């Protein structure tokens, strides 16, 4: 599909990057950005953004901005996929370096008390006393559990703005409640931590 025919979803989320071709029939290898790549499996429409500097051979025709996925499976640390729009290895190699986006609406429904990181980023964080600790800027994966990186802009004695960062483990011992509707996380965490 050509660029002018494709309408990107407003809720497009970057979920991986095409790293290489797979086989001779146009398969592509995608490095997912999550250890649980279900978003790639649940969507049959992958939106592509080309790299700033092409990594593969120059394409004979414009790169597609939408792939209609016919099959996707895990292969070690990558996802191997085939698409209607990629006919052979040369076409697959031309996609090397493209970022892969899917609609957030196509993500599988999370289980109770499970959240996609993308849904937590930007939420306000308050403690049990109602004191604002900042907003979730990012999450870190420590292997054992996720950690919220909460940032808050504060003013020092000279009136300069300083960004304060708190790292709060995303575990039941510290997380009292998560409300996606109210866009707020309540934590057992003091201002002085």
Curated annotation (Swiss-Prot):
Cellular component terms (Gene Ontology): cytoplasm; ribosome
Stored SUPFAM superfamilies: PRC-barrel domain (SSF50346), Translation proteins (SSF50447)
Keywords, in A-Z order: Chaperone, Cytoplasm, Ribosome biogenesis, rRNA processing
PRC barrel domain residues: 112-193
Presence of the UniProt keyword Nucleotide-binding in the record: no
One GO molecular-function entry: ribosome binding
Compartmental location: Cytoplasm
GO BP field: ribosomal small subunit biogenesis; rRNA processing
Entry keyword ATP-binding: no
InterPro entries, A to Z: PRC_barrel-like_sf, PRC_RimM, RimM, RimM_N, RimM_N_sf, Transl_B-barrel_sf
Superkingdom, taxonomy of origin: Bacteria
PANTHER family recorded: RIBOSOME MATURATION FACTOR RIMM
Free-text note on domains in this protein's UniProt record: The PRC barrel domain binds ribosomal protein uS19.
Subunit structure: Binds ribosomal protein uS19.
Protein task: An accessory protein needed during the final step in the assembly of 30S ribosomal subunit, possibly for assembly of the head region. Essential for efficient processing of 16S rRNA. May be needed both before and after RbfA during the maturation of 16S rRNA. It has affinity for free ribosomal 30S subunits but not for 70S ribosomes.
Family per record: Belongs to the RimM family.
HAMAP family in the cross-refs: Ribosome_mat_RimM (MF_00014)
NCBIfam families for this protein: 16S_RimM (TIGR02273)
Name used for this protein in its record: Ribosome maturation factor RimM
């Amino acid at each position: 599909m050509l660029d002018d025919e494709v309408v990107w979803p407003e809720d497009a989320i970057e979920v991986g990057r095409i790293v290489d071709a797979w086989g001779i029939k146009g398969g592509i290898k995608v490095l997912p950005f999550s250890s649980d790549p279900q978003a790639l499996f649940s969507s049959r429409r992958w939106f592509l953004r080309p790299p700033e500097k092409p990594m593969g051979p120059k394409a004979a025709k414009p790169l597609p901005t939408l792939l209609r996925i016919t099959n996707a499976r895990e292969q070690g640390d990558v996802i191997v996929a085939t698409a209607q729009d990629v006919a052979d290895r040369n076409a697959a190699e031309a996609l090397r370096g493209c970022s892969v986006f899917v609609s957030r609406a196509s993500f599988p429904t999370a289980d109770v008390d499970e959240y996609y990181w993308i849904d937590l980023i930007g939420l306000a964080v308050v403690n049990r006393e109602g004191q604002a600790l900042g907003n979730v800027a990012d999450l870190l994966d420590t292997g054992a559990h996720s950690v919220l990186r909460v940032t808050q802009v504060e003013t020092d004695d000279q009136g300069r703005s300083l960004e304060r960062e708190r790292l709060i483990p995303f575990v039941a011992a510290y997380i009292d409640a998560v409300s996606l509707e109210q866009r707020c996380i309540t934590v057992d965490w003091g201002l002085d931590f």
